[in-house]
Amino acid sequence: MNKRMNELVALLNRYATEYYTSDNPSVSDSEYDRLYRELVELETAYPEQVLADSPTHRVGGKVLDGFEKYSHQYPLYSLQDAFSREELDAFDARVRKEVAHPTYICELKIDGLSISLTYEKGILVAGVTRGDGSIGENITENLKRVKDIPLTLPEELDITVRGECYMPRASFDQVNQVRQENGEPEFANPRNAAAGTLRQLDTAVVAKRNLATFLYQEASPSTRDSQEKGLKYLEQLGFVVNPKRILAENIDEIWNFIQEVGQERENLPYDIDGVVIKVNDLVSQEELGFTVKAPKWAVAYKFPAEEKEAQLLSVDWTVGRTGVVTPTANLTPVQLAGTTVSRATLHNVDYIAEKDIRKDDTVIVYKAGDIIPAVLRVVESKRVSEEKLDIPTNCPSCNSDLLHFEDEVALRCINPRCPAQIMEGLIHFASRDAMNITGLGPSIVEKLFAANLVKDVADIYRLQEEDFLLLEGVKEKSAAKLYQAIQASKENSAEKLLFGLGIRHVGSKASQLLLQYFHSIENLSQADSEEVASIESLGGVIAKSLQTYFAAEGSEILLRELKETGVNLDYKGQTVVADAALSGLTVVLTGKLERLKRSEAKSKLESLGAKVTGSVSKKTDLVVVGADAGSKLQKAQELGIQVRDEAWLESL
C-alpha cells in the first residue's frame, strides 16, 4: 500500500503544480478527483502511513488553540512609498549616486497579507505572518490549506521565501454571498477577507475560501545574482510568481508601465494597490543597503486613492501619547475603498489653516495609503459658512495650556501627568510591536486606568488576577489569561521594552539596533550621545532624544521599578561586540562547509561583530569560503577582497 500511496501523492502534487502554477494541466478534473479519492481511501485504511506532503493535508479538519509567536530568521522590512512621478525621479537619483547604470524590475503590489514560508530539506515546516517584521504568528496549518503553496519542493532545499497571500475577487464574491445567506456581516474588501481567513482557528474554513499566493523573494541568501533570476528560480521550485513584470532602464519606462497597469487594474482577477520598483542586481542591492525601516534599493508606487465628497459635521480633538493634539473630522458617512467612512483625520492645526477648512464645509475625503481616512481639501464652491473652526487653547484631557512650537505643525500638551498621554502610553506599551501583551488592549487599559489600578507601565506588572475581576465584563478565565500574558511579557528581549517606553523618534527598528550594540537598557541609559549617533542607520536626533529621556526625572525610577518586578532589561538576540575581532566588517559566506553548519558559521561571525550578507560587492570586507565556492569566490578575487577558509573561522 505504501508504494501506491507514494505514487498517488507524487502524481497529485505534480498535477496540482501543473494546474495552479503552470496553468497547463495534463489531466482532466475528473481524473484528478478519481486519484484523489483513491488516496483518501488508502489513507483512511492505513492512517499510520500518511505522507507529510499528501495533498489531503489541504482539506480542513483541525481546530487550532491559537497562533504561536515566531521569530523571523530574516527580518521583513517595509517599503518606502512614492505617490508621484517626482518621487520616483528622486528615488532614481538616490540610487544613481551609488549605482551608475541601474536596471530596475517592476512588479505588481498585491493587496494581500505578507507571508514567509520556510522549507527544510524541501518540506514546508513554517508559514508565518509578517507581524512587526521581526516576530510574526505561526499560521502553518492554515497556509497548508492554500492550494497553490507547495507542501514539498522538487529539491531537498533549506530555503525561506516571501510573498503575498490574497483572496481572488471571484472567491471574495462567493465568500460574501455565503455570509449574506447565513446572516453574517460581509467582508469590506478582499484584503480584509484574506486577513480574517488566515486568522481562522478552524482550518476547514480556510480550505473552503480558496486563497491564493504570489511569491516574490527568496529571503535566505540567494545564489542568483538578480531579482529576475530569483523569480524564475521560484517558478522552477513550483511557486506561483506574478507574470506581470518588466525590466526597465529608466523612470520613463517605469512610468509607462505604471500607467499601463493602472488602466488594466480593474480587470485583474485580484486587487493591487501599486507597483513595486526594485534594483534588479542583487550586488547593487547590497551596495545600497537599508535604512532603519526600509531597503534603499526599492520603492512602492501607490496608485492615487479613491476620493469622495462628505460634509464636515464637527471636529474632535484627541491627545496622543507624546502630547500631540490631533483633530479628527466627523463626517456624513461615505463609502470609500470598500468601507463606510464617517471620521477622517485633519492631521494638525497647520493643515487646517493651510487648507482653510471651515465649519460645515464640504470636503474631499480619501484613504491615505489606502488605509487611513483623511480630509484632502475643501470644495469651495459648496461652502455654506465663513465661520472658522474652533481651535482649542487648552488640553482636552487635562486642561493645561497647549503650545504651538515654531518648528512643529501640531499643538502639544507638555504636562507629563496628562491622563490621556499616560493612558495612550500604556496602550502603546502593551501593543503588539512593543511588549505584545495579548488581551491587554485599549478597552482593558482604559478600565484599569479609570479604576486607578495603573498609572504607569510598571504598575502593569504589579497587577494580580483578582484586580482584573474588578473590571466590568472580565471573567475568571479572561483574568487568568491576562495575568499570564503579563507575566510572559517579562521575558521579552529588551528591544520590545525600549520601544514600549515610547521614547520620541525611537521606533522598533532603532530599538533593536540600539540593543544589539549596547546589550541592555541599563547600558544604553549610561551611553554617550556621540556613541549612539555613530551607530549605522541612527543619528543625532535619536541620540538627543535618548539623552533627554534618560536625563528626565522619573526615568531611572521607572527602570528600577520594572527591574524589581522581574521585567527583563537585557537583549536576547545576537549582540554586536564593539571591540570584537570582526567588528564593523561586512562578510560573505559561500560554498559548502565541512564541519560547521551554515547557521553556526553565520552566528559565530555575527558574535564577532560582523555583518553577514548574501552577495559579494565592493562593500564586502571578507569572504569565508568552503568547497565549491563558485562565482562569489571569483568575484571576491576580482575585487581584491580578503578570502578565508573554515579553519580560520574556527580558530577565532
UniProtKB/Swiss-Prot annotation:
Keyword Protein biosynthesis set for record: no
Keyword tRNA processing: no
Names of the cofactor(s): Mg(2+); Mn(2+)
A GO term from the CC aspect: cytosol
Pfam families associated with the record: BRCT (PF00533), DNA_ligase_aden (PF01653), DNA_ligase_OB (PF03120), DNA_ligase_ZBD (PF03119), HHH_2 (PF12826), HHH_5 (PF14520)
SMART domains for this protein: BRCT, HhH1, LIGANc
Gene Ontology MF terms in the entry: DNA binding; DNA ligase (NAD+) activity; metal ion binding
This enzyme's EC code(s): 6.5.1.2
Keywords carried by this UniProt record: DNA damage, DNA repair, DNA replication, Ligase, Magnesium, Manganese, Metal-binding, NAD, Zinc
InterPro entries for this protein: BRCT_dom (IPR001357), BRCT_dom_sf (IPR036420), DisA/LigA_HHH (IPR041663), DNA_ligase (IPR001679), DNA_ligase_AS (IPR018239), DNA_ligase_CS (IPR033136), DNAligase_adenylation (IPR013839), DNAligase_N (IPR013840)
Catalytic activity: NAD(+) + (deoxyribonucleotide)n-3'-hydroxyl + 5'-phospho-(deoxyribonucleotide)m = (deoxyribonucleotide)n+m + AMP + beta-nicotinamide D-nucleotide
Annotated BRCT domain residues: 577-652
Residues of the active site: K109 (n6-amp-lysine intermediate)
Ligand binding (NAD(+)): D29, S30, E31, Y32, D33, S78, L79, E107, R130, E164, K278, K302
One GO term (biological process): DNA repair
Protein residues bound to Zn(2+): C395, C398, C413, C418
UniProt xrefs under HAMAP family: DNA_ligase_A
Family: Belongs to the NAD-dependent DNA ligase family. LigA subfamily.
Function: DNA ligase that catalyzes the formation of phosphodiester linkages between 5'-phosphoryl and 3'-hydroxyl groups in double-stranded DNA using NAD as a coenzyme and as the energy source for the reaction. It is essential for DNA replication and repair of damaged DNA.
Name assigned to this protein: DNA ligase
Species in which this protein is naturally found: Streptococcus pneumoniae (strain Hungary19A-6)
Organism lineage string: Bacteria, Bacillati, Bacillota, Bacilli, Lactobacillales
